[in-house]
């Protein structure tokens, strides 16, 4: 691979600079082999500060790969990734983590099971570079008060269990805690990769309501992958559809507010030239 020099790329939009600005981002895995896969192809995505976009797509469409590119899991073959005007294309993931919060589908991924609830929250401060002393010395009384206050907002009784190891919590409790950790220090960008898909319906709904509340209160720029078509149209203010590593449809505003699930599926057929290949998404047509 030829090493490219990082350079700021002007936004395609006029006026205020986007919070997230992807320009011509492409990525091919295992090039020149029988396992070659074009994972992302010429992705252009510009998101304003505070914008909340949902993402749906076919199986293997590149949704998680897009998140990995933004989070710094790999350097794309071509293109640039800017966050709040700063070129992060070549920055490693641990540097980007100070500005980017992320939740995965697996509720066990975002927490340290052998550490207590309060230690995990202190770790979130450390990730953001806010209080590097918190992990290596006694957690202050002030920090504990903040943690207790934030945990109480989850309405799961975790504020009374701060000394307990996180490994004793349920999947829903751990995912709610991960959401709190990812937003304890407000990130510039929040990536939600089907973060309620592995939870039971009641818990998923609770975590989703917490998500909506936190994102709205803190005005966080957010991208959320979902397999639920109703959620894709009801949450946030913008919806993207992906297929074969491309963004094939992007809708917001009045057009989005008028759309039904059937309209969205028809738009996919028009733009991708095929039916949506994702059983979970098709089943979600009848879910609410």
Model-based region annotation:
Residues 226-227:
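H-loop/switch region of ABC-family ATPase nucleotide-binding domains
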Residues 87-101, 109, 113, 133-140, ...:
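ABC ATPase NBD coupling module
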């Amino acid at each position: 691979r030829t090493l490219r020099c990082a350079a700021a790329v002007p936004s395609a939009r006029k006026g205020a600079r986007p919070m997230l600005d992807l320009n011509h981002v492409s990525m091919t895995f295992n090039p020149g082999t029988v396992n070659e896969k074009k994972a992302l192809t010429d992705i252009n995505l510009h998101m304003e500060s505070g914008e909340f976009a949902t993402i749906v797509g076919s199986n293997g469409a590149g949704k998680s790969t897009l998140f990995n590119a933004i989070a710094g899991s790999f350097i794309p073959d071509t293109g640039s990734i800017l966050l709040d005007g700063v070129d992060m294309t070549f920055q490693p993931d641990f540097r980007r983590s100070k500005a980017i919060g992320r939740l995965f589908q697996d509720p066990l991924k975002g927490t340290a099971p052998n550490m207590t609830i309060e230690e995990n929250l202190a770790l979130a401060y450390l990730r953001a570079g806010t209080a590097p002393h918190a992990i290596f010395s006694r957690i202050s009384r002030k920090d504990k008060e903040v943690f207790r206050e934030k945990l109480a907002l989850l309405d799961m009784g975790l504020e009374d269990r701060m000394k307990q190891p996180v490994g004793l919590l349920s999947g829903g409790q751990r995912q709610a805690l991960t959401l709190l950790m990812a937003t304890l220090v407000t990130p510039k960008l929040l990536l939600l990769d089907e973060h309620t898909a592995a939870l039971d319906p009641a818990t998923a709904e609770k975590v989703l309501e917490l998500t909506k509340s936190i994102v709205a209160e803190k005005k966080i720029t957010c991208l959320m992958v979902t397999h639920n078509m109703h959620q894709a149209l009801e949450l946030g203010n913008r919806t993207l559809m992906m297929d074969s590593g491309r963004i094939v449809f992007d809708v917001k505003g009045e057009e989005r507010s008028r759309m039904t699930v059937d309209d969205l599926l028809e738009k996919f057929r028009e733009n991708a030239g095929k039916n949506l290949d994702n059983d979970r998404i098709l089943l979600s047509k009848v879910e609410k």
